[in-house]
Each structure stands twice: as C-alpha cells, then as structure tokens.
Amino acid sequence: MRSPFERRLEACQRRLERVDAALAALVPGPNLTYLTGFEESPSERHLLLFVPRVGDPVVVAPAMYDAQLRTLPIETLAVRLWDDDDDPLEEIEAVLAELLPAGDGDPGSSRDGDAPTILVDDRMWATFTQDLRACAPAATFDLASRVLEDLRIRKDDVELEALRRAGEIADRVSLEIRSRGTELVGRTEAELASEIERLLAEYGGGDPAFETIVASGPNGARPHHHSGDREIERGDPIVLDFGAFVDADLEDGTGRYPGDQTRTIVVGDAPGDEYDRYERVHEVVREAHRAAVEAVEPGATAGAVDRAARSVIEDAGYGDEFVHRTGHGVGLEVHEPPYIVADNDRKLEPGMVFSVEPGIYLEGEFGVRIEDLVVVTEDGAERLNESPRGWETGSGVQ
C-alpha cells in the first residue's frame, strides 16, 4: 500500500506534466515536508529534493541525514549523499544530468522542444538558485508554487483532523483565560502570553504556532503587537491571538498543523461611556465576522469573503480602521494561500482552510479582532473554533 507521501509525489508529477516542466527542486521547508514527511530547517548545506516529471525522486543531502532519509516511507526515493569535504555541486550536477532530458523525445523533455524548465522552491535561497543555474545552464527556471500551491491548498482528511484538534486546544485555552476574569488585572501582557503558551502545551499542543499576542488597552490598536510589560488594568479590552502546532497522524512521517484563534475580551467593568463604545465596535466586528463566514461556499471567490466582512465595517463608518485582509490560508504554514483579500478571484473549493479575522483598530484607544479558522465544505463552511466570541469574562462564561 502506498504511503500518503508517495501519493503526493505522484500528484506532483502529474502537475509537472500539466505545466510542461521537467522537474521540481525543493529545499527544507513546507513543500519538502508535504511531499516526503522530512522536516528540517534550512541551512547553508545543500539539501535538495528533485522530483522529475518522469522517473523516481532523488534527494541530495549531507551524509549526516542518511539515517533519517532512508527511513522515509517512499520506496522509490533515491538518496545521494555528500560529505563535508566534498563539493555538493558535483553531486547536484550529476543528478541533474541524469534527470533532465538530453533532447527532444527524451522522457520529461519539453513538448515544444524548448529548454527544460526547472521549478525551484519559492523559499530557495538565491545562492542555491544560482548554483542550480550553474549546474544546468541550458534550463529555464520558474517557481514550484505553480504545482505545489494547487496540491497543498486543499487539505485531506488527515490534515483536517490535525487542524480540528488544534482548534479544540485553542478553544480550551480561550475558555480557561476567560474564566479568570479580573484575576488577569495586574498581570503583564508578557506574563499572560507565557501562561497561554503553557496552557496550549498542557492541553496537548506542541510549539506555539506563532508569537502569542496579548494586546491590552491602546496596544490592541496594533494588529501584530508584541506582548510587553504593560500591566492589564480593570476595564481593559484585550486582544488575544494564539495557537499551537499539532502533529498530523501520518504513517512514518511528520507534518505539523497550527491553531490560530483571536478573541477580544474586556476584564472587569469599564466606565459606562467607554464600555458602550467598546461594545458597539465589538458588535460591528462580530457582524463582519458572521457575514464573512456566511459568504464561504464552493464557487465563491476569496475576494467575496473579504468584501462581505469589509462592507459591514465600512457601512458602520470604520472602513479606514480595518487595515488588513480578512484572512489567510492555514496548513503546514500559518500563512499560506488562499489569501482572503478583496482582489483575489481564486474560487473556493472544498477542503480549503483559512482564517476569517476582521478587525477595527482605533489608534491610541483600543482594537477589536475576532478570528476563527474555517474549512470550505460541500455546501458552506465548518468552523474549527467554537469558543465564545463575545466580550464576557468570568467563571460563568460558556
């Protein structure tokens, strides 16, 4: 029985055929992890996966990775190693000579007889791209997102299950923080951020998926505020944005998928006029969020979802204070396609996962953002977050 990674590699090869490319060249990062299950950080050492349109994939890697690469669940994967005292470009040049077509009629050759095209990882360092050009001077180059984006943008059942678990963990943390109510008064943003990350781990999450945001009072007007030493005060609105990675249940491979949730709460009682204003702005954002989720369905465009949220906020007079797109795709990366922005005509399809996170940011005063992850289903949207979206805090919140 083929592993999930073998099926993904075959799908990649079919797409290489579709775009008339000879091969894809990938470096450590989400694309390589998606196709092989191998997870490693980029470094100055040459580690490249070559996926030819026709034939078996080949990985060129430092010898130090031999054991990890040979246990990957891909029977057809050829492993070519180099030692630190070797010139890795000699091995890369030899592999490219084997994989690239020598002329018209060879497997993988361009249909129109032009030079073969190599699709390079969008995250490949410029120095590595220059090395590939030197090793294959007759080739033309384009970006691997031409084939990998279309593969990764629709999540399979295993990926969706990991994303659901990440959402459930975020929900549990959200409820726990809300339940503490005025106990949060006097704590710094950084202290609360650390507590959120501790709870994410306690409830089964892995590493934080991104820097946890605790933005209290006027700091909430900065969408990507760095949690600092400001002490939370009674009556403060607080923007909380957090999530943790969860491992997908892939046989003999890895793949981490993130949670990503934002809630805005008020701790204790604010003065009446201020609280009324907080509540009005929060309700506008909440209605924008509802409108965007209701706009999600197969065949709708990503731009239509953005416009659904944006029109609510503009009609309420806060259009200039909604300073970012409505959402972003989520998968092996916290930010990936599809991007939920007004001019994106990409049609939504079942299995796509993205955030819906409208916000209003009033500089020097406060901010409000509400974010859930949603999955496009056959007839609409499934929310991956179900924790309360209102202002309320305290032990009675459900």
Where are these regions (language model features)?
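Active-site neighborhoods and metal-handling regions in enzymes and metal-associated proteins
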Residues: 1-398
